[in-house]
Amino acid sequence: MSGKRVLALYGALLFCFAAVVCRLYWLCSDTDYGARAAAQSVVTLHLPARRGNFYDYRGQLLTGQTTRWMALCVPGEGSYARLFAYTDAAGQATLYQKRNAASPFLLEVDRDVSALGVSCWPAARRSSAAPLAVQLLGYLDGEGHGAAGLEAAFDELLTGSGAGDTLLCTVNAQGKLRAEPVLTPADSGAVGVQLTLSREIQQTAEAVANETMQSGCILVLDTANAKVRACVSRPGYDPENISASLNAPDSPLLERAFQCYAVGSVFKPVVAAAALEAGESGFVYTCPGWCAVDGRIFRCAGGIPHGEVDLAGALEKSCNGYFIRLGQALGADAVRAMAEQLGFGQAIPLTDALHTAAGVLPEREALASSGAYANFCFGQGELLASPLQVAAMMNTIACGGICRTPLLLETTLDETTGTPLTVLSHVRSRRVLTKRTAAALQALLAGVVAGGTGHEAALPGQTAAGKTGTAQTGQFSGGTELKNYWFAGFVPAEQPRYTIVVLQDTQAEPAFSSAAIFARVAAGLEILAP
């Protein structure tokens, strides 16, 4: 090789070497590049998004009461073996799938596992092992948004921006941690929603329902303001396992307190109210156990004759014939108008997006039929109402004739400070009954419990008032008609504090009467009373 070629080769090599040196110098002095390189070694993990909670009227949590834990799984640290026993089947599947992962990941575990040398962080669990008011509150979809009930109605408020805390993990090429993870809190802007429910009263009613009913609901209203203190529907469901209940024949997702049902004799106080307002309190009827209307026979329960009964006796014995004849004396317009004033046939708004079923208040034209009107007078036929409508009616009697729309919402809350933000509902009231009529009805309904069909609602040491109802549904099982069993009333009878409605729907023969269930709830309320 000639000398010129050797010099050229050496020159080329020298040039390449100089270029490499210059490039290295530039890389070392370029801070932006260094930052970008560092960023490439940081893994960002997202903790579950924070969601606003529901609170009772005293500010106690109804959701988010329990804690779940998110454990950090790091490659090469034996996460599979250490955490397998502390997570559920889905978590175990995740561990298996990511057993050879090249970067850290988060895994939900059932406890704080920091004692195992594993970093973990708490996050609120939406539902507890014994969730409250599940049909009312609703549930979340797979993306964490409200899919039913109040969760859906307030989804935008509760979700906020949807942001959650982030975990910054600096790792090496093998995915192992180079430094302690850094938790970066996020402010999603989500707010809480305060309801009128009482957590203690709700828990009491839930416990009674669990012990006594298969299908139905329990409502408790604060008589003074018609605020809903408890709203229980049975059967229940697991908000974290919706698929198990979607096709269940007993409809566990249904909020029964807001649906409409045949009401039966629990409607008779409405007819009694119309009579008292019209000055017909002295009406007397001799009951042979049945009543003929244009050739059609309407029987009292079991066809049992009640003999001569006045308004008090007819309510105590729940005499169908008496109320048919009383209704005929009053006229359909008067009875229907009273029912309308007491809220029948009208949906009760709970939120902008949630309201009860309106039910069915038969039109005047329908009640022109003597048979249809006879049925109407003792709560049968086309008449349908929701348990909350029945509660509003009974509450009107209990609070002296003032009809107040039942309320479910209080305010939105700043969850950090507990400060109320926006009032969500206001008391709406109007006088429907005179004080004299309401007082007379209170005494009459106290008689139903003291010596009538509602005797199982009686409490030792405390008075109660109310009305039973057994409504035909037209549905049969094994040749036996299924019925709706009601009790609606208030405690104490003299100075009512709570209005309680119990419904057991589409049952052949329930294990407990609705009056007995009412008594259990009332006894629980007495224990809770300060």
Q: Which residues does each PLM region occupy?
A:
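Periplasmic/cell-envelope proteins involved in peptidoglycan metabolism and beta-lactam response
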Residues: 1-243, 283, 336-341, 457-458, ...
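Beta-lactam-recognizing serine transpeptidase/beta-lactamase-like catalytic domain environment
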Residues: 63, 222-265, 270-504, 530
